[in-house]
Each structure stands twice: as structure tokens, then as C-alpha cells.
């Protein structure tokens, strides 16, 4: 480790006069222009447009060499030992021991001490007991692999009375031991002088920070720390979050010392804090920097705010919001020594004035910009009126860009950042981990994409502790602390393991599994498109009236019916259905080889049985499939799909209990028989049931549904397969379920449980054992739930193996966690918390785009059910309501199909086809590859991109061996007789030809003979 703080990144040296022209060119092309106050307002316009999908998702890259990786803690939150070894009382000791909490305080909840009184407030008396566990804490640092550790010195521990005098030797010894241990580990300290815990003696004697005299006491305390510890400390923080200290300590009273004063008092305290900070900076700069070589700053917290509407007024309000929180302290220090103009204009009677000498004294008193950004400081303690009716957002990247523009490109050290989980959450803190990932990724984007000079990042905090106004109701540590235990052992959470891996890799380096694969699919690969319910329009394009009419030309100018005269009934043809040909044309334009759609059971059999058959609808479907075959597109037909109303069932069956009624299974088998009989000559791929949704289906309904599928399969297998030579299976929705915490065995078990309930419930009886998954049965039995029916041995034999291929629909990936964090998304039935990685790209309907989930679910199915032929029967994403340029879908298809290729080539998955969802926006709004507007279908960019992939049969590259695929021709089933009997056909043709020639000769010579006779 270097002995001194790393130097600032080098700036270009001033060029000589002889290079003045070059200076101008470099200044325009390379040097960053000087920023001025107010320039930060450009940030909102810059980020107003959504980023391209490839930029919005996972960002791969590493941080600059020498980047500072830190973790932090604060004295009162973690040290404990509040009366040990001569420590004086702080304002937080007094504040937490007070029986009445201020308004909005929740510290009484979740008291860790186990005290019987529910009204006893939580305190930091013991907290994480860091005062007695230096080795324990530093071992945690070693596990993380951080380069820096931020901690604060308890003012009352080194100076019990707060003022200069004889320091507390035991307090000094504790911090020396900590610093020495850090030196042994090669971890550099980042030391905060004041983290909210003012000695109570100074509060009583002077009224705390409301008294200007406190600045001198703070200077004396800082001098003591610089003298005793400065040789080992290269980064100093004077005051942590002066906004919270001033506003919530002295104006709202939400935090210690709990003074519910006027806003004027809050602004006065902030004024004194700025002067106190400046005094300490000048002290270090004059007396200690020459020998110690460190840097000093102040930790400023901020929120981020977005305009309700992208108007000049809303943007000005956002700028004002940041001025009132961050700019309140940042502008005096980093710009000109005075408050933001927006504050002075709005608070002229409340805001104290700086003298000219004070402005000069405060200006420039920071060697780097120390930024805090987190839930408590940036959001929970943000006064509502300081939002100015705009929308706060946890967007760290935008804030970093704003600071860069507003304060002239400072070096930024993020000295506090993180999130929180519930106080009941133990070590699987998935929510915290993904927020940590999001914030670090946004920091990397700010560095790489926006050019912001961020030099370090601090995760908050090292361990669970006392969380100020929230007490112990939340946890923010990377290490878990059992506050009820005597030992207070630190146990790494998932977030700690994640942070350790991230530091080890210095960011998010590109991983081999995330790289696209070049290659092509087999020649007979099925490229399909899905339209769950095609446009059924039985209106004929020709006249169907059999009557004869005369045109009354001379009088009424109308058609007059001729009574008693009718024409012969005209035979109907498929071309009569006007709606079919436009759909066929669009499919041909897409170059797909297969088209999947669902039949409407309720339209074909309105009563659910063959007592009333809609032959017109059947003729329409028959024409649809025959026309598809004619143009060499293979129809893939689903018999049933759950859809409102009536779950896609005939109304009578729905009223009689739907799938709860065993009779529905028998009715389905008869319906299937009719469809096979009427359509089977043209349909070679059948789906019995498409995506039966297991999450809202009862066990008895699922039981009957499985039997219905099996009955239909056996009908086809025994009565139609030999003549029609088709294949039949069921299509199951198979979204991937990923453990939220990849390091947690419990989360892995939870993920497997959900997969069995979501997919295995219907898949295991068909593709596996013939019975329900044992995981499912065992879980329900443990909870005394005996509603899952049992199959008889005959039923198992009936159901098992009723497939010719495995068809799955896949759209997204869901994370599951064993910890109950969000009651709204918690599934009590399966004891699982569903969540998402907030760094994932999402569609407008908040469906996560996770391409690698498709590959994982394909491998899971292969592992569970063997090397079966598989079809991805549906895969797609929604776009914006008026999105003509559907770049999200282009990105989605490109990456999901590439993952399918990886599964086929790298994993040996027997993948036979891919079907994109959906055909058009008319039948599936916001999902279509064709846009429907003004009664016309217009191709979206995604359709053209899909066509390109189809034409290439995948993703061929320079290293890919070209695969020759012979062109396929339409097979005419009606002409098969002639194809198999070519010699006979030739002989008949010869006889016909000879007959014609003979007839011609006879005619010729007979005519010639008549002429001669005449």
C-alpha cells in the first residue's frame, strides 16, 4: 500500500506559447470546459431519453487501476461500550435513553436487548460491540478484501467533556489499536471526526451547534486527532451529513439532540457547521498537511430528483431541490463561499449571511468531493417540501453527472452508499445485494460513459448496527450481527460475498457465458411465429345470395328480385375467406417455416359437444391450415388455451365447473377427435393445451387437465397417427427461477421448489414418472395440505409418456429468496419471496429481460426428463403502447435466440424450433412483430431482424462453417398417388398421347377422303 494518499489524476501541463494554436484545438477537442453553477441542469435533458437496450442492462467493464474499494461504519452505530473506560455521554446516549421519542420515530420497535417493556427505546449502548472486538471487525475487512475502511472517532470517547483538556487514554488506545491492525492488513483508514455524536457536555454548556463557539471546540478536537492519528490517516472527513445534523437535529427534532426549533435555527446550525468545517480544513492545511500528506473533505449527502414533466419549470424545481439539500453546503465549499442563489431568493429572512472574509475562508475547503447516497440520508430523512413537488429517484449515475457539471468536475469519493433490509432478515439479504450491484454499476457507467472522475466507492456498512431513527427495525450491514447473542459474531451475508467477488474482479469484467456465440441451427430447424388467436373472419369475398335480380334501369335504379328463380348453389372455396390471404402474405414476408395458433373450442362447439358443430368455423380453420401448407408453412395448432372469458371453454362446460369437473376431460377428448378428423390431414404438429397457468389453478383442475391431455394424445395415437403421421404434445410455460442469493443453499432449495410447482406439476406426470413431483407432495404433506390428488396405477400409465416432443413457452426469469422482505410479493404458500435484479433490463410492463434464463431452463428440463426433442413454442416481450421502433424486442430476440443456439451447440440440447411471440398487435397488443394501424399491418424493426436471423439460420460468422441447406418444396398430399407411381403415370400419358394422335389422323384422312369423293 502507498504511504500517502494517491495523487490526483494528472491534468495536461500548460503548453508553451509556441503551441498556442494547438492549445485552442486541444481545448476544443480534448479538455473539459469549466463548469459553472447551474450547469447541472443539463443533466435532466441528457438522461431524458431512455438508453438503448444494450446500454440499459448489464454494463460490463472494470474500474480504473487504483480505484479505492471501501466499507464504512460509524462510532455510535457499532461501538457500544457507552460507559466503558471513561467515555463521556453523547447527545445520542441522551436522546435514545429519553422515554419520549420525537414525532415519526420508530426506535421503540425491534429492541435487541430483549427487555420486557415494549416501550423501552432501542439504544446504541452495546450495538455491535465493536469497542471490544477490534480483531473481529478487522478480520471482516480482510475477508472483504477492501483497500480502505471508513470509521468515525467518538468525540466523547477521546474527550469525555468535549473540550480540550486531558484526553481519555483508553479511548485513544482503542483507535490506535484499530489503526495499527489496519496497517497490518494493508487497509487504509478514512476517518470521520464527527458522525452526529456530539458530547452531551457541549450540548448542555453551549446549546450544541447552535452556538458559534462550538467551531473552536471542534477545531481543538480535530487537532488532537490529527496529532495522535494523522501519521496513519490519509483521508479525513470533518463532518458527516451536515444537512441531517442541522435540519433534523435542530429544526424537526427527529434526530439527536431532538430540538424542535424553527427553520431559522436549522439554517443557523448549518452556517456554524460550515465555519467549523472550514476551520478544521485550514488547521490541517497549515499545520499537518506538509508532514502528513493527507486530504480533508466533508461528507455531503444528497437525493436525486426527476421532473414530473420535462418542462423548464419542473427542471428548475429539480435544480432548486438539489440546491436546498446538497448545494446548501457544496456551493459554499466548492464554488464561491456562499449559498445557492435559489436559497437566498427564497429564504432571505431565514438564511444567515456570510461576510466577505468568511466566504473566502470557506471557499475551496475540500480536497475531494465526499458523497453519501443511501436510503436513510438521501430519502427517508428528506423533508417533503424540499422535493418541490418533483419525483425522487435512487439514481446515483445522474447525481454523479450533476455534481460533475455543477461543481466543475471535482474528484468524487463515494464515502457512503448502500441500501437496507428488514430487521428480521438474516444472511440472505438479496434486496440489499442487488441495490449494491445497481449503485456500483451506475458508478462504473458514470466513469466510463459520462467521464465523471470517481476515485472510490464505500459500501455501507461493514456490519449491522443501530440505525438512528429506525433503531434495529432495519439492517444495513454486509455482516450479520445477532444482537441478542453475547458474542456478537460477524457472519458474512450474501451482500458481503458479492462485494468481495466484485472487488476481486475490480468491477464487472466480460464473462465468457455473456458473449454471443456464432453458429447456425440445423437445416430442418423450425422458425415460427405465434398468434394465439388468429383473426377469424368468416365473411366470404363473393356473393352468397342464390336469388336472381334484374336491374331497373329506367325507373327505380335498383335491383329487383325475380320471384321463383334461383341459381344453383355455388361450391365454397378457401379463397372466398377474405381474411386468410392477407395473413398468409404477412407470414410469407417474414420467411417463417411454421405458424402456431390456437383453435377456439367455444366457437367450434358452442355447447361443448358435437350436438352443435359450427361447420363454417371449421371450414375457416381448414382453409387456414391448407393455405399454409400450400405456401410451404407448417401449421402448429393448439386445441385449447386458457383465456377469458370462461377459461377458453364453451360456456356450458365453464358453468358446470370447468376443469374441476371430470366430465370436461371427456368432452375435450371428443373435441380433439373432431379437430383431428377435420384438420389432421394438413396439421403435422399438435398442441393439446397451450400454457395452462399453474399459479391460479387448483390441484383438482390440474388433475383433470392432465387426464384430458392424455386422452386426447391417445385418441390421436390410436386413431389418426398412422394415416396423418403427425406429432402431438403439451406446451408448458417454463420461466426460469433463479436463487436470489447465489451463495445461499436455502435459496437454491427454494428455487427448485418453485420450479417443481410451476413446471414439474404438469411436466413430471407426462415426461417423467407418471406421478406428481415428490418435492411437491412432500412440501404439501409437511403443511398438512392433502388436496393434491393421487393417480391410480392405470391413470399413471395413461398419462406417462403422452408426448412426441417437449414444448415450452419462456418469457422471463424470476428471482426467489427464502427471506420475507416484501409482504406484497411474498408467497406464504411456498414460503418464498419473489423479486428481481434491479440492474436487469425491463419491458414497459416490468417483465425482466434475462436471456441466459432460457438456456438454464432448457438444461434443467434436459436434466429432469432426458434428451427429448424440444421446441421453444413461444418467446417474446411487450413494447411501448405507441412504439414503432421496437428496439427492445430486437435486443430481446437477438439475445434469447443466441442463448438457444448456445444451448443447442454447447450443451447438446435437442432443440428443434423457435417461435417468436407474437404475430401482430391486433390480436396481441404491444407484443406484435407487425404494427396494426389504420386497418393496415406494418412491419416493425423486430420483424425485419427476425427475418434476417431466419434467412441466416442463426448467427453465422467468419469462423462458422457454412452449412448448405437444400430448399424445401411444398408437399401436395393430394398428389402423393402420382409421386409414388411414376411409371404408371408415364404409361397412361403415352396412351393418352397415342389416342390423341390417332384421333387426329383419323379426322384428317376422313376429311381428305370426303374432298376426293366430292
From Swiss-Prot:
Keywords for this protein: Cell membrane, Glycoprotein, Glycosidase, Hydrolase, Membrane, Repeat, Secreted, Signal, Transmembrane, Transmembrane helix
Signal peptide from the UniProt entry: 1-35
Catalyses: a beta-D-glucuronoside + H2O = D-glucuronate + an alcohol
Q: Which GO terms describe its molecular function?
A: beta-glucuronidase activity; fibroblast growth factor binding; fibroblast growth factor receptor binding
Q: Which InterPro entries match?
A: Glyco_hydro_1 (IPR001360), Glyco_hydro_1_N_CS (IPR033132), Glycoside_hydrolase_SF (IPR017853)
Its Gene Ontology cellular component terms are: apical plasma membrane; extracellular region
Give the protein's recorded name.
Klotho
Traced from the root, the source organism's taxonomic lineage reads: Eukaryota, Metazoa, Chordata, Craniata, Vertebrata
Amino acid at each position: 500500500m502507498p504511504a500517502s494518499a494517491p495523487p490526483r489524476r494528472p491534468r495536461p501541463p500548460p503548453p508553451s506559447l509556441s503551441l498556442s494554436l494547438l492549445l485552442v484545438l486541444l481545448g476544443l477537442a480534448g479538455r473539459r470546459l469549466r463548469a459553472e453553477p447551474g450547469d447541472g441542469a443539463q443533466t435532466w435533458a441528457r438522461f431524458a431519453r431512455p438508453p438503448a437496450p444494450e446500454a440499459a442492462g448489464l454494463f460490463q467493464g472494470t474500474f480504473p487501476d487504483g480505484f479505492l474499494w471501501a466499507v464504512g461504519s460509524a462510532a455510535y452505530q457499532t461501538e457500544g461500550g457507552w460507559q466503558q473506560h471513561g467515555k463521556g455521554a453523547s447527545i445520542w446516549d441522551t436522546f435514545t435513553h429519553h422515554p419520549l421519542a420525537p414525532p415519526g420515530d420508530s426506535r421503540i420497535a425491534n429492541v435487541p436487548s430483549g427487555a420486557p417493556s415494549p416501550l423501552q427505546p432501542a439504544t446504541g449502548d452495546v450495538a455491535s460491540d465493536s469497542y471490544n472486538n477490534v480483531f473481529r471487525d478487522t478480520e471482516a475487512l480482510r475477508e472483504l478484501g477492501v483497500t480502505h475502511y471508513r470509521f468515525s472517532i467518538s468525540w466523547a470517547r477521546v474527550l469525555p467533556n468535549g473540550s480540550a483538556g486531558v484526553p481519555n487514554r483508553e479511548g485513544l488506545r482503542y483507535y490506535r489499536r484499530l489503526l495499527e491492525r489496519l496497517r497490518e492488513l494493508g487497509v487504509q483508514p478514512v476517518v470521520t471526526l464527527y458522525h452526529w455524536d456530539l458530547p452531551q457536555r457541549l450540548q448542555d454548556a453551549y446549546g450544541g451547534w447552535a452556538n458559534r463557539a462550538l467551531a473552536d471546540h471542534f477545531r481543538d478536537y480535530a487537532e488532537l486527532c490529527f496529532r495522535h492519528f494523522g501519521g496513519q490517516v490519509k483521508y479525513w472527513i470533518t463532518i458527516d451529513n451536515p444537512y441531517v445534523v442541522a435540519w433534523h437535529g435542530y429544526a424537526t427534532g427527529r434526530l439527536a439532540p431532538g430540538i424542535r426549533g424553527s427553520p431559522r435555527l436549522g439554517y443557523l446550525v448549518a452556517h456554524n457547521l460550515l465555519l467549523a468545517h472550514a476551520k478544521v480544513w485550514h488547521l490541517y492545511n497549515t499545520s499537518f498537511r506538509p508532514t502528513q500528506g493527507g486530504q480533508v473533505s466533508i461528507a455531503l449527502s444528497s437525493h436525486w430528483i426527476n421532473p414530473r414533466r420535462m418542462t423548464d419549470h419542473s427542471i428548475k424545481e429539480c435544480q432548486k431541490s438539489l440546491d436546498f439539500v446538497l448545494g446548501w453546503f457544496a456551493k459554499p465549499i466548492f464554488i464561491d463561499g456562499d449559498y445557492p442563489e435559489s436559497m437566498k431568493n427564497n429564504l432571505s429572512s431565514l438564511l444567515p449571511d456570510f461576510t466577505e472574509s468568511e466566504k473566502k475562508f470557506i471557499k475551496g475547503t475540500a480536497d475531494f468531493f465526499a458523497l453519501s447516497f443511501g436510503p436513510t440520508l438521501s430519502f427517508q430523512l428528506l423533508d417533503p417540501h424540499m422535493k418541490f413537488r418533483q419525483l425522487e429517484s435512487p439514481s446515483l449515475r445522474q447525481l454523479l453527472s450533476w455534481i460533475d457539471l455543477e461543481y466543475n468536475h471535482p474528484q468524487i469519493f463515494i464515502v457512503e452508499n448502500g441500501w437496507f433490509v428488514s430487521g428480521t432478515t438474516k444472511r440472505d439479504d438479496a434486496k440489499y445485494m442487488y441495490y449494491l450491484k445497481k449503485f456500483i454499476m451506475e458508478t462504473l457507467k458514470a466513469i466510463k460513459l459520462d467521464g465523471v472522475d470517481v476515485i472510490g466507492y464505500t459500501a455501507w456498512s461493514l456490519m449491522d448496527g443501530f440505525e438512528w431513527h429506525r433503531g434495529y427495525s432495519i439492517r444495513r450491514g454486509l455482516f450479520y450481527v445477532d444482537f441478542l447473542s453475547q458474542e456478537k459474531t460477524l457472519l458474512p451475508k450474501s451482500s458481503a460475498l458479492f462485494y468481495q467477488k466484485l472487488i476481486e474482479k475490480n468491477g464487472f469484467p466480460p464473462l465468457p457465458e455473456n458473449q454471443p456465440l456464432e453458429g447456425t441451427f440445423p437445416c430442418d430447424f423450425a422458425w415460427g411465429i405465434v398468434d394465439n388467436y388468429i383473426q377469424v373472419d368468416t365473411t366470404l369475398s363473393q356473393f352468397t345470395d342464390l336469388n336472381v335480380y334484374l336491374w331497373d334501369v329506367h325507373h327505380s335504379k335498383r335491383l329487383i328480385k325475380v320471384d321463383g328463380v334461383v341459381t344453383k348453389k355455388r361450391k365454397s372455396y378457401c379463397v372466398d375467406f377474405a381474411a386468410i390471404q392477407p395473413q398468409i402474405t404477412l407470414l410469407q414476408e417474414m420467411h417463417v417455416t411454421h405458424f402456431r395458433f390456437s383453435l377456439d373450442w367455444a366457437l367450434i362447439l358452442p355447447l361443448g359437444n358435437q350436438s352443435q358443430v359450427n361447420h363454417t368455423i371449421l371450414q375457416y380453420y381448414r382453409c387456414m391450415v391448407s393455405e399454409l401448407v400450400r405456401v410451404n408453412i407448417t401449421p402448429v395448432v393448439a386445441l385449447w388455451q386458457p383465456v377469458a372469458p370462461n377459461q377458453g371453454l364453451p360456456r356450458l362446460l365453464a358453468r358446470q365447473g370447468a376443469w374441476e369437473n371430470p366430465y370436461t376431460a371427456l368432452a375435450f377428448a371428443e373435441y380433439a377427435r373432431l379437430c383431428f378428423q377435420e384438420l389432421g390431414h394438413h396439421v403435422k404438429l399438435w398442441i393439446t393445451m397451450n400454457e395452462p397457468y399453474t399459479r391460479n389453478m387448483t390441484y383438482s383442475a390440474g388433475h383433470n387437465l392432465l387426464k384430458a391431455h392424455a386422452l386426447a394424445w391417445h385418441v390421436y395415437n390410436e386413431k389418426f397417427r398412422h394415416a396423418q403421421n403427425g406429432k402431438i404434445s403439451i406446451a408448458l410455460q417454463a420461466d426460469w427461477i433463479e436463487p436470489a442469493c447465489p451463495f445461499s443453499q436455502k435459496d437454491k432449495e427454494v428455487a427448485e421448489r418453485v420450479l417443481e410447482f410451476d413446471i414439474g406439476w404438469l411436466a413430471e406426470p407426462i415426461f417423467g414418472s407418471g406421478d406428481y413431483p415428490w418435492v411437491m407432495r412432500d412440501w404439501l404433506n409437511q403443511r398438512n395440505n392433502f388436496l393434491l390428488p393421487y393417480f391410480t396405477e392405470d391413470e399413471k400409465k395413461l398419462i406417462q409418456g403422452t408426448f412426441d416432443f417437449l414444448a415450452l413457452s419462456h418469457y422471463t426469469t424470476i428471482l426467489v429468496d427464502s427471506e420475507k422482505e416484501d409482504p406484497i410479493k411474498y408467497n406464504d404458500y411456498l414460503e418464498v419471496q419473489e423479486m428481481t435484479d434491479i440492474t436487469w433490463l425491463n419491458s414497459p410492463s416490468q417483465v425482466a429481460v434475462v436471456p441466459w434464463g432460457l438456456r438454464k431452463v432448457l438444461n434443467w428440463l434436459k436434466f429432469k426428463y432426458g434428451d427429448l426433442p424440444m421446441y421453444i413454442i413461444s418467446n417474446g416481450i411487450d413494447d411501448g403502447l405507441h412504439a414503432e421502433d421496437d428496439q427492445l424486442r430486437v435486443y430481446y430476440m437477438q439475445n434469447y435466440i443466441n442463448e438457444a443456439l448456445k444451448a443447442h451447440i454447447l450443451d447438446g440440447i435437442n432443440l428443434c424450433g423457435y417461435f417468436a411471440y407474437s404475430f401482430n398487435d391486433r390480436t396481441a397488443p404491444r407484443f406484435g412483430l407487425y404494427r396494426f394501424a389504420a386497418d393496415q399491418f406494418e412491419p416493425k424493426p423486430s420483424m425485419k431482424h427476425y427475418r434476417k436471423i431466419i434467412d441466416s439460420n442463426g448467427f453465422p460468422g467468419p469462423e462458422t462453417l457454412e452449412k448448405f441447406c437444400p430448399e424445401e418444396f411444398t408437399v401436395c398430399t393430394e398428389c402423393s398417388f402420382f409421386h409414388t407411381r411414376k411409371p404408371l403415370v408415364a404409361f397412361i400419358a403415352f396412351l393418352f398421347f397415342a389416342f390423341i394422335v390417332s384421333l387426329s389422323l383419323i379426322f384428317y384422312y376422313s376429311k381428305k377422303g370426303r374432298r376426293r369423293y366430292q
